[in-house]
Regions:
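C-terminal segments
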Residues: 111-204
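Conserved short-loop catalytic and cofactor-binding motifs
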Residues: 18, 43, 78, 148, ...
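Conserved NAD(P)+-binding/catalytic subdomain of aldehyde/semialdehyde dehydrogenases
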Residues: 1-42
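Gly/Ser/Thr-rich active-site loops/lids in small-molecule metabolic enzymes
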Residues: 6-12, 38-45, 49, 53, ...
Length: 204
C-alpha cells in the first residue's frame, strides 16, 4: 500500500487564446475536456481580438454532432469564458483557478513566463493539445485538480522513491560560534514549547 496526497477530479481545463488562435482547435479541446463527465470544468480565457461569437457558434455546431452531447451539455453548466486584457492578466486569472490542464494556444510564448504559472500540467503552443497528454505525449496524467496544484504536483517517478535526510553536527562542522548558535536557538524553541527535556538534551 502507498499513501496518496489527494483524490483527484473532476477533470478541468483552462484554455488561453488570442486573436490568432484557431477557434476550431479551441472548441475541440474545450469539448474534449467537457466530455469527461457532467462535473467537468472548462474555462476559456480570451485576449482581445479572439472571435468569441464564432467560438460559441462552432461549439454549438460540434456539440450537435457529438456522441456524448448529453454529458457535455451538463458539463457546460460548469464552464465559462473569461475576458483578459493581456497575456499576463490571463495567466493571473488562470493562477486563481490552478486548473488540472492549462492550454496556452498562442505561438511564440516567452518561456520566461513559465515559472509564474500554476497548473497541474501546461500545454504550450497552438498544436499542443491536452488530449495528447491524456494518452501518449506526457506529462503524467495523474494531475492535481481543484486548485491542489497550489501545493502538490503530478505523479512522477520521484513519488516511488523513499527519501531521507542526514545531519552531522559538531563544533568543527560550523563556522565560528555557529554550533553554539544552533544549540541556543534550538533550546529557546524547545523551552517556548514547554519541552524541557528537549532543551536539557542540548545543554553542554
Amino acid at each position: 500500500q502507498v499513501g496518496i496526497d489527494s483524490l483527484n477530479g473532476p477533470s478541468e481545463v483552462a484554455i488561453i487564446v488570442d486573436e490568432n488562435s484557431s477557434v476550431e482547435y479551441a472548441v475541440k479541446d474545450f469539448l474534449a475536456q467537457a466530455e469527461h463527465g457532467e462535473d467537468s470544468r472548462c474555462f476559456l480565457i480570451h485576449l482581445p481580438g479572439f472571435k468569441l461569437n464564432l467560438f460559441k457558434e462552432v461549439l454549438e455546431k460540434n456539440l450537435s454532432k457529438s456522441k456524448r452531447k448529453e454529458i457535455i451539455n451538463d458539463a457546460l453548466k460548469n464552464c465559462c469564458s473569461i475576458n483578459a486584457s493581456s497575456l499576463n492578466h490571463a495567466i493571473s486569472l488562470s493562477n486563481l483557478i490552478i486548473p488540472e490542464h492549462l492550454e496556452i494556444l498562442i505561438d511564440d510564448i516567452d518561456l520566461n513566463l513559465m515559472p509564474k504559472i500554476r497548473a497541474g500540467a501546461i500545454f504550450i503552443g497552438t498544436e499542443s493539445s491536452a488530449v495528447m497528454g491524456d494518452y501518449c505525449a506526457g506529462p503524467s496524467h495523474v494531475i492535481p485538480t481543484g486548485g491542489q496544484g497550489r501545493f502538490s504536483s503530478q505523479l512522477s517517478l520521484n513519488d516511488f522513491f523513499v527519501k531521507t535526510s542526514f545531519m552531522v553536527a559538531s563544533k568543527n562542522s560550523y563556522k565560528k560560534n555557529g554550533y553554539k548558535a544552533l544549540l541556543d536557538n534550538s533550546m529557546k524553541i524547545a523551552e517556548s514549547e514547554g519541552l524541557w527535556e528537549h532543551a536539557n538534551a542540548l545543554k553542554e
